[in-house]
Regions:
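ATP/nucleoside-binding phosphotransfer catalytic cores, i.e., glycine-rich phosphate-binding loops
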Residues: 58-125
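ATP/pyrophosphate-binding catalytic subdomain of soluble kinases
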Residues: 1-53
Length: 125
């Protein structure tokens, strides 16, 4: 298990079904930065809508004397959990797809475990 104290603007977690939105925008930024700094190739990360893994990216991680910024991108596979613990004294929130109306409080000491659900989303066209 990897443990890291972080200060950031949040974390984006995408399903295969949701990888065409915010995740795609973040990856475009990563590719642009890698190209600008001659850091090599950053692949397109596209998964099928039925992909049984989650992908996460930390938004604007800020390294300091007390925080790290190494664990900023990864996957959560079947039977794995990503555990987040809030250090926000107040105004910490969890929300889905940019909709704050259905947000949940996520303040200091609260723990969130994220994994793959048994239920599968379906896209109807």
């Amino acid at each position: 298990d990897v443990v890291e104290n972080q200060s950031s603007s949040g974390i984006i977690i995408s399903t295969g079904l949701g990888m065409t939105g915010w995740h795609k925008s973040i990856m475009a930024e990563f590719r642009g930065m890698a190209k600008a700094f001659n850091l090599g190739f950053v692949p397109e990360v596209e998964k099928g809508w039925d992909c049984r893994e989650l992908t996460f990216q930390v938004r604007e991680p800020y390294p300091s004397r007390f925080t790290q910024a190494e664990l900023v991108y990864g996957q959560i596979h079947e039977r794995e959990k990503l555990t987040l613990v809030s250090d926000m004294a107040e105004s910490g929130v969890i929300f889905s797809d940019g909709i704050l109306d259905d947000s949940l409080d996520f303040n200091a000491g609260m723990e969130l475990k994220i994994g793959i659900a048994d239920r599968v989303g379906r896209l109807v066209v």
